[in-house]
Amino acid sequence: MEVYIPSFRHEDSDLERGYTVFKIEVLMNGRKHFVEKRYSEFHALHKKLKKCIKTPEIPSKHVRNWVPKVLEQRRQGLETYLQAVILENEELPKLFLDFLNVRHLPSLPKAESCGSFDETESEESSKLSHQPVLLFLGDPYVLPAASDFPNVVIEGVLHGIFFSHLQPR
């Protein structure tokens, strides 16, 4: 799993003063998705993670400082924090995966120490779904044959499909 925070933006709200939203890019198993979180959500995650695993330091919250340089330092610090949690823990807690909107892997022992799958999800929803994958290493019709003998079956089928208007050899 790879995690980056490529950007942030300022949100204005009628009910409260504005806040900053950090855009988190999550790359896992060849798939990429984005999650947006406020600093307060990072801080809440940190408090919960400290009870389950050894955590790195989280960047401090500056007193309503909207200076772009300070926000950029916080973005870098939060990115480093997420990457350190991943690097320092062989198995990631369920609440960390929830934070990143990553589908749970049912065989993570440390995940259960932070909350069991049975508490929040049914057995059906926590199962991994099967995603068939097709892999073509190369086109067998373009690559040279492994032996010097022609494959008469393949030649016959290809001739019949693509050259049916021609007479046989």
UniProtKB/Swiss-Prot annotation:
SUPFAM superfamilies, alphabetized: PX domain (SSF64268)
Keyword match Isomerase: no
UniProt modified residues of type N-acetylmethionine: M1
Main location: membrane
GO biological process: protein transport
Modification sites for Phosphoserine: S113, S116
Record-level Gene Ontology MF annotations: phosphatidylinositol phosphate binding; phosphatidylinositol-3-phosphate binding; phosphatidylinositol-4-phosphate binding; phosphatidylinositol-5-phosphate binding
Alphabetical keyword list: Acetylation, Cytoplasmic vesicle, Lipid-binding, Membrane, Phosphoprotein, Protein transport, Transport
Sequence positions that bind a 1,2-diacyl-sn-glycero-3-phospho-(1D-myo-inositol-3-phosphate): R38, S40, K61, R74
Presence of the UniProt keyword Acetylation in the record: yes
Pfam families given in the database record: PX
Cellular compartments annotated: Cytoplasmic vesicle membrane
Boundaries of every PX domain copy: 1-125
Membrane topology (UniProt): Peripheral membrane protein
GO cellular-component term (any): cytoplasmic vesicle membrane
Gene3D superfamilies: Phox-like domain
Family annotation (PANTHER family): SORTING NEXIN-22 AND 24 (PTHR15813), SORTING NEXIN-24 (PTHR15813:SF10)
Notes on the domains: The PX domain mediates specific binding to membranes enriched in phosphatidylinositol 3-phosphate (PtdIns(P3)).
Function: May be involved in several stages of intracellular trafficking.
Family membership noted in the UniProt record: Belongs to the sorting nexin family.
Name of the protein: Sorting nexin-24
Source species of the chain: Rattus norvegicus (Rat)
Classification lineage: Eukaryota, Metazoa, Chordata, Craniata, Vertebrata
